[in-house]
Amino acid sequence: MNDIKMAALGALMLLAAWPAQAQPADPLARGRYLVESIAGCGNCHTPKGPQGDLPGLALAGGQVFDEPPFRAVASNITPDPETGIGRWTDAQIARAIREGIRPDGRIIGPPMPFELYRGISDNDLAAMVAYLRSVPPVRNAVAASE
């Protein structure tokens, strides 16, 4: 099974077990839980080395998925204004997560959007956006997907 299908399957299994009522009162805590656990954003957006996640590059993108006919490169989703999502509005970040659309209207491309992310509640989506805004910005320019 290729990496993209494995990531999608993992996200599907986690979302299927997602408790509807178990939401922390703190949106930032909820966002952290969703980004780091349930949605598994770091599985694609944190670059990996032989020993696992590369230190200091959490959510900074650059991981490559060569799955012909696509070559997907995970984007930097830290709030860095030059190489990440720091200049995006909250609505643009939410649209990218839910619909896979960039601020300029282009499709992000495989594997985003995960079809499952379309069903995220507005509150959970806002919590994810708030959390992504709170992580340390990491300057890490990545290549475009092909």
PLM segments and residue spans:
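Bacterial N-terminal signal peptides that target proteins for export
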Residues: M1-A8
